[in-house]
């Protein structure tokens, strides 16, 4: 287990490109103790040109938990966080552990993006984020279902993603649970429709 005050990530075949990356991030964190985590921009290496601008929207400012979850804002290889501000919350089913980590850190402090490019995020067809199969969809459905309870402040996003993955499981004839997923999908969509209708009615 790491014992230092700060922890930085560089997973798999991602890599850092700025030799002063860690110094810049530690300096920021030391000067701004109210922040639990900081991150920065990255270049993307991918065979798919659609991926190249994935993080172009990032700019130097504070980000909320809702923002980073809604748009999946943070490149994992850019992260440095204060270990003492981490309040670990983890669902039993966890495919994408990075977003769980970031939301947990958002509970312990603020999040900030620094204005420099400090690494390369490599995206390829074999990665978990690019896979498309029913086993993965089922696992993600359960992860978001649990995250609804663990992170109530961003429950709306978890619910939408849960319904999205549930919809992808409706036609999986190889699973005994398909009928359950179909029933849950109908019920969740009904609740979502009623909620939106009530909100619109109240506003009008």
Language model regions located:
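Glycine-rich, basic loop-to-helix element that forms the pyrophosphate-binding segment
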Residues: 1-2, 24
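Short aromatic/hydrophobic "clamp" motif used to bind/position activated sugar donors
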Residues: 7
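The conserved acidic donor/metal-binding loop of glycosyltransferases
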Residues: 11-15, 41
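Conserved donor NDP-sugar-binding/catalytic core segment of glycosyltransferases
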Residues: 20-52
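Conserved nucleotide-sugar donor-binding catalytic segment
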Residues: 40, 54-135
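Catalytic core of nucleotide-sugar-dependent glycosyltransferases
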Residues: 66-67, 103, 121-125, 130-155, ...
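Membrane-interface aromatic/basic loop that binds lipid-linked glycans or pyrophosphate carriers
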Residues: 149, 169-204
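Amphipathic alpha-helical repeat scaffolds of TPR domains
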Residues: 158-172
């Amino acid at each position: 287990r790491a014992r230092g005050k700060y922890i930085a990530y560089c997973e798999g075949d991602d890599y850092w490109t700025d030799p002063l990356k860690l110094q810049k991030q530690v300096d920021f964190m030391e000067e701004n103790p109210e922040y639990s985590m900081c991150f920065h921009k990255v270049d993307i290496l991918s065979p798919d040109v659609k991926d190249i601008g994935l993080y172009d929207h990032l700019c130097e400012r504070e980000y909320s938990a809702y923002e980073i979850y809604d748009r999946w804002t943070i490149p994992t290889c850019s992260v440095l966080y204060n270990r003492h501000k981490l309040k670990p919350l983890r669902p039993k089913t966890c495919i994408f552990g990075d977003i769980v980590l970031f939301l947990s850190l958002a509970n312990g402090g603020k999040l900030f993006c620094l204005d420099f490019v400090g690494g390369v995020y490599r995206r390829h067809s074999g990665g978990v984020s690019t896979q498309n199969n029913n086993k993965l969809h089922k696992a993600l459905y359960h992860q978001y279902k649990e995250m609804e309870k663990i992170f109530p402040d961003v429950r709306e996003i978890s619910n939408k993603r849960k319904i999205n993955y549930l919809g992808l499981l409706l036609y999986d004839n190889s699973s005994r649970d398909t009928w359950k997923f179909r029933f849950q999908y109908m019920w969740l969509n009904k609740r979502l429709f009623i909620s939106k209708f009530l909100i619109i009615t109240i506003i009008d």
